[in-house]
Amino acid sequence: MYGIEYTTTLTFLILLILLNYILKSITRIMDYILYRFLLFVVIVTPFVNSQNYGINLPITGSMDTNYQNVSNPEPFLTSTLCLYYPVEAETEIADSSWKDTLSQLFLTKGWPTGSVYLKSYTDIATFSINPQLYCDYNIVLMKYNANSELDMSELADLILNEWLCNPMDITLYYYQQTDEANKWISMGDSCTIKVCPLNTQTLGIGCLTTDTTTFEEVATAEKLAITDVVDGVNYKINVTTTTCTIRNCKKLGPRENVAVIQVGGSNILDITADPTTAPQTERMMRINWKKWWQVFYTVVDYVNQIIQAMSKRSRSLDSAAFYYRI
């Protein structure tokens, strides 16, 4: 009986010693692998151009924060940039290969060939009918013209912000604007907008609901019209529906992947609808050059600084759908 107990105890001790040996062997092997791996990392690290990620990056709800822990000096290599310009620039430059030249200049700033798209538009009024902004970053050049200053301001308000829009049936319903973010946006070849404010008995205030000639005209033959009326009041609306489409829109916030560069003019256009607030100049910039080559040279020279004031977004603007948050 004692012999069996001694044998069991001896077997247990042998297994314990064997297990201890195995564990020590595994530990030595792991230490060997770990030390070799760390040595490899130390040797290779100076030769690797990697992007470092901080542990405590702030989550702010905005992508505008400039993170200083990016070791790659060219953060825009995987992005696309659209540059919109009036067609008069092509006429003045009169060089069939000018886009290739500009592409090579963008390459010196870290934008590979094929990542920058140059798109022309006829004029502000035409561009207002159907602005389409599809790139990760979009820069719109607008040449200042005193005669089209208000058109430029409305177009800037449209493309620098995101809008959520619904159709309006003005033949059946009255409409009212609920707050400052609520606007009526009209687009078309010719938009003439007339409104008649109503009292609580749905009678016209200073106008007759049955006679559109007594309505108050707020836009005349415009291609783009952003209408702002007194909030909380019902309105009967008259629009030239054969040449214009009107939508009830809500401004959701800034469209941060779009910037507008005003070419010329003494001051940057103010697109703020509320007269009690400071002028809205965020992502609104100005270049004072007479020649278009000078304008493009300046854009190339400062393109990365301009991009830093923007945020890369995947959503695009296609007003053909008249639904601005896509």
UniProtKB/Swiss-Prot annotation:
UniProt-annotated location(s): Virion; Host endoplasmic reticulum lumen
A Pfam family the protein falls into: VP7
Keyword Signal applies: yes
Annotated keywords: Calcium, Capsid protein, Disulfide bond, Glycoprotein, Host endoplasmic reticulum, Host-virus interaction, Metal-binding, Outer capsid protein, Signal, T=13 icosahedral capsid protein, Virion
Name of the featured protein: Outer capsid glycoprotein VP7
Residues passing through the membrane, by range: none
Functional summary from the UniProt entry: Calcium-binding protein that interacts with rotavirus cell receptors once the initial attachment by VP4 has been achieved. Rotavirus attachment and entry into the host cell probably involves multiple sequential contacts between the outer capsid proteins VP4 and VP7, and the cell receptors. Following entry into the host cell, low intracellular or intravesicular Ca(2+) concentration probably causes the calcium-stabilized VP7 trimers to dissociate from the virion. This step is probably necessary for the membrane-disrupting entry step and the release of VP4, which is locked onto the virion by VP7.
Subunit and partners: Homotrimer; disulfide-linked. 2 Ca(2+) ions bound at each subunit interface in the trimer hold the trimer together. Interacts with the intermediate capsid protein VP6. Interacts with the outer capsid protein VP5*.
Segments of this protein annotated with the region CNP motif: 165-167
Signal peptide: 1-50
Entry binding sites for Ca(2+) 2: 177, 228-229, 231, 301
Remaining remarks: Some rotavirus strains are neuraminidase-sensitive and require sialic acid to attach to the cell surface. Some rotavirus strains are integrin-dependent. Some rotavirus strains depend on ganglioside for their entry into the host cell. Hsp70 also seems to be involved in the entry of some strains.
Annotated GO MF terms: metal ion binding
Positions with a binding annotation for Ca(2+) 1: 95, 206, 214, 216
Gene Ontology CC, one term: T=13 icosahedral viral capsid
Principal place of residence: virion
Organism: Rotavirus A (isolate RVA/Cow/South/Africa/Offal agent/1965/G8P6[1])
Glycosylation site positions: 69
PTM section of the record: N-glycosylated.
Family to which the UniProt record says this protein belongs: Belongs to the rotavirus VP7 family.
Segments for region (GPR motif): 253-255
